[in-house]
Amino acid sequence: MFFVWPAIGNAIAAFGQLASQLGVFGSFIYGLMLRSLYVCGLHHVFYLPFWTTAAGGVAEVGGVMIEGWQNIFLAQLADPNTTHFFGNIALYNSGRYIHMLFTMPAICLAMYHAIPDKKRRKKTLGFLLSLALTCFITGVTEPISFALLFANPILFIAEALIFALGFVACAVTGVTIGSTFSAGLIEFLLFGVF
């Protein structure tokens, strides 16, 4: 196995480099790859270069050149002269807010209504409600993704496509809401409202 994982890591890195060079379409590729890798935990390998290296962009903030959209975002937060956040935040982060705040809780609601037996539906309400609230408040989506993947793998593919389209929507409209961990209500309020 020692020779397999470096090849997989290199392939993921190649997709990342491709996405970083394609603008808005690259944000679609980024979103699709990111969501597809969530269920196996490999999304960390994919997104980290965008957050911390030149793959996520390079910008001058306060006279200092900074690499990576998250590093740039954090530097801009500290810079009183910032009037608008770095554009690559729209390409590689803001789309997550659409998904964590709206799509994933709606998926929980759809799974609830898809249960035909009302007794079983009532038993799963607490489970699905806790998943939806966790996602909405903190942006942690893995429990919903696993439930969806086990319930209907084809819908998981559709969910990944919707996730990617959220990135495109933010890239086209120029929505630049940064984050430090995930894209739940807490970070939306901190970085998108206040």
What do the PLM-derived regions correspond to, one by one?
Residues M1, L48, L91-K119:
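Transmembrane alpha-helical segments in integral membrane proteins
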Residues G16-I29, P80-H84, K118-F127, L155-A158:
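Membrane-interfacial loop-to-helix junctions in multi-pass transporters
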Residues E60-I89, P105-L109, H113, F127-F194:
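Transmembrane alpha-helical segments and their short flanking loops
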Residues F2, A19-G23, C40-G41, Y97-L101, ...:
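Hydrophobic alpha-helical scaffolding
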Residues M1-T53, A171-G174, G178-F194:
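Signature of multi-pass transmembrane helix bundles
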Residues F2, F15-A19, A90, S94, ...:
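A near-ubiquitous, low-amplitude feature marking generic local secondary-structure context
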Residues L48-F50, A54, K119, L148, ...:
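Residues in flexible loops and secondary-structure boundaries
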Residues Q21-Y92:
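Interfacial loop/helix-cap signal at membrane boundaries in integral membrane proteins
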